[in-house]
Every structure is written in C-alpha cells, then in structure tokens.
C-alpha cells in the first residue's frame, strides 16, 4: 500500500527574477523574467504529486494575500493542508535571484510559518507507510519547538520513514537541537555545501577525543576541498548512524547506508537553465518513491533523473512528470 508524504517544512511565496549578476551594495540593476510563485516546501510537495503520490502540508499558514495564494496553489495541485492557521500574521515570502551562471541567491522574510506554537504538529500522526519530510529551516524559527516536540514524541516507536533536509541552517542550530536530530536517525539528504556543515558540526562533537578529532578534521578538510568521495560519505554515515545522500550536481549523488559500502549513483548531465528548486525536486521524488516501497538506491537514481530534467526549466517548481523521468531512465518504476 502506498503511503503519503507529509511535510513539516514551511511554504512561502517566491518572488523570482533573473539578473546578469547579483548587485553589489548600492548598485541598481534591472531584472527579467519576474514571477511570483509558491515555493519552499511546496516545491518538494509538488514533486511528490508529479510522481502521482499523495502529499500533505502540516506547516502553519497565515492570513493575508501571500497565505491566500499559498492555499489556492495547494488546492490546485491536490496537496492537503493539515496544519494550523495563523489569524494574525500573513505567510512569508522570499526574493530569489538567478544569475547568468544559473546560481541563486535568496532574501527571505519570516511569516506565520516561522511562528508556530509548540503544539503545531501535535495532530500529525503518520502511518507506517508514510514518509515525513523535515526541513532544517524549521529549526531556526519559533516553530522549531513544535518540530522538536514531534521528533521526541515519535522517536521511540517510529515506524514511518523520516527524510531530513538539513539546509544551510544546520550550521546555526544549537548543539542540543543537532543532537536531537542525530538521535532521530532520519535519512539525511543534502548537497556538498551542507555536507561540509554537517561534518563541521560532527567534528566539533569529537573535540573531546583527540583521535576522533584528528580523523574528523581530516574528513572536514576533504569535503571543504569539494572532494566528496566514498571515504567522506562513509564517515558521515558512520557518525550519523543513518543513511546519507549527498547530491553532487550533474555527477549524481553519493549514497551511504549503515552496513553497506558507499556508492556514487550517476547523474544525468544537462545544460542548466535554473538550479532553483533542484534540491527540492530531488527530495520530493525521493520521498514519493520511498512511499511506494522503492529501494533507497533506486529512489535516489530516479531523483537524480528528475532533478536533471528540472534544471533545464526556469522556476522553483519544475519537477518533470513521472513519464518524463521514466523515459530518461529507460524504464518504468
């Protein structure tokens, strides 16, 4: 039986635009291809729906024009909102700049999604076949208390799958929060930059042991030098005691599962038009296929294909449909 994907992340509105280069302080530039679209965790849930799997959003949505756009978009895409509403605040928004090299820069506001009370996720009770997607961005807002309450409530008897996207915010969460996520043992899904940040946090925990500290510092240096390889990913997996996925762009993704050797699952090189949302696409397809019982290695391979197609299109929510992914893979999944 196929489950559903439940997001505990945040849905906001993306104001996207293209620029030749991100402006310097005091500079005035004109942008092109300006669009207003619902984004953040919506991009992940959109990818889930493109795979034909049910999706629910449990985050807080506010009251106001941004919130209205979010609710309408969720309804249009068949995504159920199972979270709380904030009658006082509007939802947040983000300005996303994509430069001529397809790199992106973000400026975000905090809206209702960031101010959830500690009981915000108390009504979320995933079933065994469900996949819960957690975003590191939630851990740096007040809604973190609700997320940590959910994690603690479900740790001991958790039967569902949890996928954690640490985001760059993993560098700023306090040690107790970091340890809580370590103890939860989700599937960690990150890019190379985030892998570096995770390694740095793990190395800091090893400071009390000179042997472990030396090894961890060597690994951190390898990752910082953009040398994500079998050894570094295996080390991350061992220290996290959980499956680890490290996305490496057109080269695909590294996967390490406790007890198995780390392996690189090849990507599908494409000419990138816009990398905005590629990671969200990867995560959504991964979660959707795990709901269907697809083995983790195969799910990562499909996610690689989907995100490769996604970067050939402009916009934050550009996940291809299932048939397009199957054509690229040359098989049905």
Model-inferred region functions:
Residues 2-6, 200-333:
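Conserved phosphate-binding/catalytic region of the ribokinase-like
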């Amino acid at each position: 039986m196929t489950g559903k994907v439940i997001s505990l992340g945040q849905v906001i509105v993306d104001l996207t635009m293209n620029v030749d280069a991100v402006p310097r302080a005091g500079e005035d530039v004109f942008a092109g291809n300006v669009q207003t679209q619902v984004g953040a965790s919506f991009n992940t849930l959109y990818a889930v729906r493109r795979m034909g799997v049910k999706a629910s959003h449990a985050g807080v949505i506010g009251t106001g024009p941004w919130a209205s756009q979010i609710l309408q978009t969720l309804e249009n895409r068949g995504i159920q909102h199972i979270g709380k509403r904030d009658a006082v605040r509007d939802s947040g928004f983000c300005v996303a700049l994509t430069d001529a090299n397809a790199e992106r820069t973000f400026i975000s506001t905090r809206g209702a999604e960031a101010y959830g009370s500690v009981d915000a996720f108390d009504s979320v009770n995933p079933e065994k076949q469900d996949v819960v997607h957690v975003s590191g961005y939630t851990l740096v807002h007040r809604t973190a208390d609700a997320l940590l309450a959910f994690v603690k409530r479900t740790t001991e008897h958790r039967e569902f799958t949890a996928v954690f996207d640490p985001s760059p915010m993993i560098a700023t969460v306090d040690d107790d929060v970091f340890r809580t996520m370590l103890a939860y043992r989700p599937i960690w899904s990150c890019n190379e930059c985030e892998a570096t940040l995770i390694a740095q946090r793990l190395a800091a925990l090893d400071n009390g042991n000179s042997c472990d500290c030396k090894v961890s510092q060597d690994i951190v240096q390898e990752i910082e030098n953009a040398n994500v390889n079998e050894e570094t990913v295996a080390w991350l997996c061992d220290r996290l005691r959980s499956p680890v996925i490290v996305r490496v762009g057109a080269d695909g993704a590294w996967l390490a599962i406790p007890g198995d050797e780390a392996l690189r699952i090849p990507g599908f090189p494409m000419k990138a038009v816009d990398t905005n949302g590629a990671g969200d696409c990867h995560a959504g397809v991964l979660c959707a296929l795990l709901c269907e019982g697809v083995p983790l290695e195969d799910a990562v391979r499909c996610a690689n294909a989907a995100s490769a197609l996604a970067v050939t299109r402009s916009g934050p929510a550009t996940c291809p449909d299932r048939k397009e992914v199957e054509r690229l893979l040359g098989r049905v999944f």
